[in-house]
Amino acid sequence: MRENRIGIIGCGNPFMGNDGAGILVMQLFEGRCPGVDAIDGGTGGFGLIPLMEGYERVVIVDAMTGIGNRIGDVVVFATPPSLDLPACSLHDIGIGDAVAVARELGCVAEIVTIGIEVGDIRAFHRGVDPAVEGGVRAAEKEVVRLLWDWMDEPCGTLAGSKPGGGSESPSPGQGSSRVRL
């Protein structure tokens, strides 16, 4: 078992523009909360499986296409994302496949995947589009919500950021969230 109980794995390639959205979310949690590791999952695939091993709970955040109605939408998957989602980058296997294999192997007790709808992926482009940046912020809020659910006590900068019970309508370009079971 790892020292820290929770891993936040960001996937993507920051040199492919919007594909780097998952990495941006992960970076927001680096050093932010004791008991939580922020992990660069690279471009995902089979390499995710050993990264998950030994954690009680893992959140995987990745750029995805075909999951939202508009760019910046955020979807929280309590079960592996559909295996027929179109790939949005050059992963050797999809996130859904990696999650399914990790669950089958018993690598981790609970895995939640957060997808950010990114639309087009542009090669050799740094930074994300403004609507995707809104999705990054919405995904950050979803990770904070999960950490509040999973941890006995709030930690670090999460202490003052407990998510509210009401649903807020996001401003244009700020992403919206929904849960798929």
Regions found by a protein language model. Give the residues of each.
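A short glycine/serine-rich beta->alpha loop
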Residues: 10-15, 84-87, 125-126
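Helix-loop-strand module that forms the ligand-binding subsite of alpha/beta enzymes
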Residues: 64-111
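Nucleotide and nucleotide-moiety/phosphate-recognizing core
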Residues: 3-8, 14-80, 154
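Phosphate-binding/catalytic loops
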Residues: 97-172, 176-181
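Short beta-strands and strand-loop turn motifs
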Residues: 9-10, 148
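Conserved active-site and cofactor/substrate-binding residues in soluble primary-metabolism enzymes
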Residues: 20, 24, 43, 90-97, ...
